[in-house]
């Protein structure tokens, strides 16, 4: 009997040890949910985590982005060409009209994600046209990728034989997120599980089952969206949609005890745009100076004031540029410190 009892005790001790290890692992596991409207920069933050906290992109992985980059570049110039008609803008050189027609035809016939020389030559000629540049300046009046100017002004490099996308090229590439993408990494003794959820309206119903046991929500809102409308509804201002979404998340009963961090993203695009387009486009009551600091702060306050439990729940906010690795590294470091502090508070150690 003694031998049986000691075997049981041993088994019990092993089980206890395993449960303790599992509990410790759970305590060190951080479930991060990235939420925000479409095209706010969520997937770019995920790419940065791969660069900062994993091993970055291998040569093979970088090469896989070529087709996406060429696709993004072509879609961008086509969007500008179409907008030339809708906005009734004339080409600086009438010969570009033929180029535009040729491009439209080629776009339908080439293999997706390729960039034949004839096509890249046409795109480069179009991009230099004064009419196209005037149309590009009015990008908030139609749907255009943020990366349009970045790729189009550097197309010569992108079509050089043997081209390998740089980290920045990869960060700027855009693929609509459908479904949920999980990324795992370790940092400061914590195991992170980060979930990127599609932001377009049709994708949001998939969020609900991610809510269980979330440690922290990073809500991403594009500062530069204040003069833009939704891809899926051209009657709705993107900033208003983002505020509406933030309101429903920060006051949701599911998240009463969840840390929430607000990333006011695309500060680089915003700082350029605010020089030309007044914030009152989005907030008619705003009559402050139309500067990066004042307008940016006003937007931040609009978000933070939606928090109905301000007395007991603090929402931390950061101005971010998701394509700037150093900025994201710095901000994510601060977010991790908040998570550690909140965790210690929950354990009664803080």
Swiss-Prot record:
<feature type="binding site">
    <location>
        <begin position="171"/>
        <end position="177"/>
    </location>
    <ligand>
        <name>GTP</name>
    </ligand>
</feature>
<dbReference type="GO" id="GO:0046872">
    <property type="term" value="F:metal ion binding"/>
</dbReference>
<dbReference type="GO" id="GO:0050917">
    <property type="term" value="P:sensory perception of umami taste"/>
</dbReference>
<dbReference type="GO" id="GO:0009416">
    <property type="term" value="P:response to light stimulus"/>
</dbReference>
<dbReference type="GO" id="GO:0042462">
    <property type="term" value="P:eye photoreceptor cell development"/>
</dbReference>
<keyword id="KW-0342">GTP-binding</keyword>
<feature type="domain" description="G-alpha">
    <location>
        <begin position="28"/>
        <end position="350"/>
    </location>
</feature>
<keyword id="KW-0716">Sensory transduction</keyword>
<feature type="region of interest" description="Interaction with RHO">
    <location>
        <begin position="340"/>
        <end position="350"/>
    </location>
</feature>
<feature type="region of interest" description="G4 motif">
    <location>
        <begin position="261"/>
        <end position="268"/>
    </location>
</feature>
<dbReference type="GO" id="GO:0060221">
    <property type="term" value="P:retinal rod cell differentiation"/>
</dbReference>
<feature type="region of interest" description="G2 motif">
    <location>
        <begin position="169"/>
        <end position="177"/>
    </location>
</feature>
<dbReference type="GO" id="GO:0007632">
    <property type="term" value="P:visual behavior"/>
</dbReference>
<comment type="subunit">
    <text>Heterotrimeric G proteins are composed of 3 subunits alpha, beta and gamma. The alpha chain contains the guanine nucleotide binding site. Interacts with RHO. Interacts with RGS9 and PDE6G. Interacts (when myristoylated) with UNC119; interaction is required for localization in sensory neurons.</text>
</comment>
<feature type="region of interest" description="G1 motif">
    <location>
        <begin position="31"/>
        <end position="44"/>
    </location>
</feature>
<dbReference type="GO" id="GO:0097719">
    <property type="term" value="P:neural tissue regeneration"/>
</dbReference>
<feature type="binding site">
    <location>
        <begin position="36"/>
        <end position="43"/>
    </location>
    <ligand>
        <name>GTP</name>
    </ligand>
</feature>
<feature type="binding site">
    <location>
        <begin position="265"/>
        <end position="268"/>
    </location>
    <ligand>
        <name>GTP</name>
    </ligand>
</feature>
<feature type="binding site">
    <location>
        <position position="177"/>
    </location>
    <ligand>
        <name>Mg(2+)</name>
    </ligand>
</feature>
<dbReference type="GO" id="GO:0031683">
    <property type="term" value="F:G-protein beta/gamma-subunit complex binding"/>
</dbReference>
<dbReference type="GO" id="GO:0003924">
    <property type="term" value="F:GTPase activity"/>
</dbReference>
<keyword id="KW-0547">Nucleotide-binding</keyword>
<dbReference type="GO" id="GO:0050908">
    <property type="term" value="P:detection of light stimulus involved in visual perception"/>
</dbReference>
<feature type="binding site">
    <location>
        <position position="146"/>
    </location>
    <ligand>
        <name>GTP</name>
    </ligand>
</feature>
<dbReference type="InterPro" id="IPR001408">
    <property type="entry name" value="Gprotein_alpha_I"/>
</dbReference>
<feature type="lipid moiety-binding region" description="N-myristoyl glycine">
    <location>
        <position position="2"/>
    </location>
</feature>
<keyword id="KW-0479">Metal-binding</keyword>
<keyword id="KW-0472">Membrane</keyword>
<keyword id="KW-0519">Myristate</keyword>
<dbReference type="GO" id="GO:0120302">
    <property type="term" value="P:background adaptation"/>
</dbReference>
<dbReference type="GO" id="GO:0014046">
    <property type="term" value="P:dopamine secretion"/>
</dbReference>
<keyword id="KW-0449">Lipoprotein</keyword>
<feature type="region of interest" description="G3 motif">
    <location>
        <begin position="192"/>
        <end position="201"/>
    </location>
</feature>
<dbReference type="InterPro" id="IPR027417">
    <property type="entry name" value="P-loop_NTPase"/>
</dbReference>
<dbReference type="GO" id="GO:0016020">
    <property type="term" value="C:membrane"/>
</dbReference>
<dbReference type="GO" id="GO:0042670">
    <property type="term" value="P:retinal cone cell differentiation"/>
</dbReference>
<feature type="region of interest" description="Disordered">
    <location>
        <begin position="1"/>
        <end position="21"/>
    </location>
</feature>
<dbReference type="GO" id="GO:0001750">
    <property type="term" value="C:photoreceptor outer segment"/>
</dbReference>
<feature type="modified residue" description="Phosphotyrosine">
    <location>
        <position position="142"/>
    </location>
</feature>
<dbReference type="GO" id="GO:0071257">
    <property type="term" value="P:cellular response to electrical stimulus"/>
</dbReference>
<feature type="binding site">
    <location>
        <position position="199"/>
    </location>
    <ligand>
        <name>GTP</name>
    </ligand>
</feature>
<keyword id="KW-0597">Phosphoprotein</keyword>
């Amino acid at each position: 009997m003694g031998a049986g009892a000691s075997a049981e005790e041993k088994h019990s001790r092993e089980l206890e040890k395993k449960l303790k290890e599992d509990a410790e692992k759970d305590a060190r596991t951080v479930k991060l949910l990235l939420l925000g409207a479409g095209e706010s920069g969520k997937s770019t933050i995920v790419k940065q985590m791969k660069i900062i906290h994993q091993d970055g992109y291998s040569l093979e992985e970088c090469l896989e982005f070529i087709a996406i980059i060429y696709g993004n570049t072509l879609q961008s110039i086509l969007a500008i060409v179409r907008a030339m008609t809708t906005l009734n803008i004339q080409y600086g050189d009438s010969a570009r009209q033929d180029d535009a027609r040729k491009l439209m035809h080629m776009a339908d016939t080439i293999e997706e994600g390729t960039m034949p020389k004839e096509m890249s030559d046409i795109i480069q000629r179009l991009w230099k046209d004064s009419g196209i540049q005037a149309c590009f300046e009015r990008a908030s009046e139609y749907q255009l990728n943020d990366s349009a100017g970045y790729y189009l002004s550097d197309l010569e490099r992108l079509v050089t034989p043997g081209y390998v996308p740089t980290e920045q090229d990869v960060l700027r590439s855009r693929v609509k997120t459908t479904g949920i993408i999980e990324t795992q990494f370790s940092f400061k003794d914590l195991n992170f599980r980060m979930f990127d959820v599609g932001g377009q309206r049709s994708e949001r119903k998939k969020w609900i089952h991610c809510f269980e046991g979330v440690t922290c929500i990073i809500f991403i809102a594009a500062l530069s969206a204040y003069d833009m409308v939704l891809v899926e509804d051209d009657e709705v201002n993107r900033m208003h949609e983002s505020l509406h979404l933030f309101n429903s998340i920060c006051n949701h009963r599911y998240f009463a005890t969840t840390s929430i961090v607000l990333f006011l993203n695309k500060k680089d695009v915003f700082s350029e745009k605010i020089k030309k387009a007044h914030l009152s486009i989005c907030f008619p009551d705003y009559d402050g100076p139309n500067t990066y600091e004042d307008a940016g702060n006003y937007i931040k306050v609009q978000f933070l004031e939606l928090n109905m439990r301000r007395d007991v729940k603090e929402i931390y906010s950061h101005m971010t540029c998701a394509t700037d690795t150093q900025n994201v590294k710095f901000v994510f470091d601060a977010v991790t410190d908040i998570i550690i502090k909140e965790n210690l508070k929950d354990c009664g150690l803080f």
